[in-house]
């Protein structure tokens, strides 16, 4: 278990990163990054720059635990070294970045490599608005994305505006029912269930 003070940052950087425990960064940021080179910049103890410079041949970020960043942000990133590499983001746990105060971030991003990467989602992603705040922002991106049955996504706000979930793959198939029939897609039932708790934007590049 890892917990920071308010505004703190946790950055786990390696070719393969796995989390099965809990990481709590109130008003702060958590990075789980598969890469060989990352540039960090700090000012007065706060992270001001986080740039993934170089990927790896076989990269993996695997979160089966709980990451909580109230008013903050959570980033799971896997960058490939080249087009013959592999970079995968797996999320089967809980990610929560609710907005509970004014000007809060409330952001969750799962980013596999956009050329050869894969992002697999079967867990919970919550970026809701509390105390009158708008819902947050969730993004799942990679060349291929699999949104599995049982995935829970919510950017709801009882007193504010519902937030947005962006699904951004190279290509994507919406299949009948809950099963995924291609290497990148979501079941229509799973998507329908998601639309009850978040706005969804599907964009392909």
Each language-model region and where it sits:
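Extracellular and secretory-pathway beta-repeat/beta-biased strand scaffolds
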Residues: 1-205
């Amino acid at each position: 278990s890892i917990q920071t003070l308010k505004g703190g940052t946790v950055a786990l950087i390696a070719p393969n990163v796995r989390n099965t425990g809990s990481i709590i960064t109130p008003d702060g940021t958590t990075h789980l990054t598969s890469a060989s080179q990352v540039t960090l910049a700090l000012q007065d103890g706060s992270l001001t720059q986080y740039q993934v410079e170089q990927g790896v041949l076989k990269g993996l970020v695997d979160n089966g635990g709980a990451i909580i960043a109230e008013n903050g942000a959570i980033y799971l990133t896997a960058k490939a070294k080249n087009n013959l590499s592999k970079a995968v983001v797996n999320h089967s746990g809980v990610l929560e970045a609710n907005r509970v105060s004014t000007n809060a971030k409330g952001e969750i991003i799962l980013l596999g490599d956009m050329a050869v990467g894969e992002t697999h989602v079967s867990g919970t992603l919550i970026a809701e608005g509390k105390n009158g705040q708008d819902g947050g922002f969730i993004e799942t991106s990679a060349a291929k994305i699999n949104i599995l049955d049982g995935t829970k996504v919510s950017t709801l706000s009882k007193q504010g505006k519902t937030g947005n979930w962006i699904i951004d793959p190279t290509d994507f198939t919406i299949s009948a029912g809950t099963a995924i029939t291609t290497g990148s897609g979501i079941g229509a039932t799973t998507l329908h269930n998601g639309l009850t708790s978040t706005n969804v934007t599907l964009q392909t590049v």
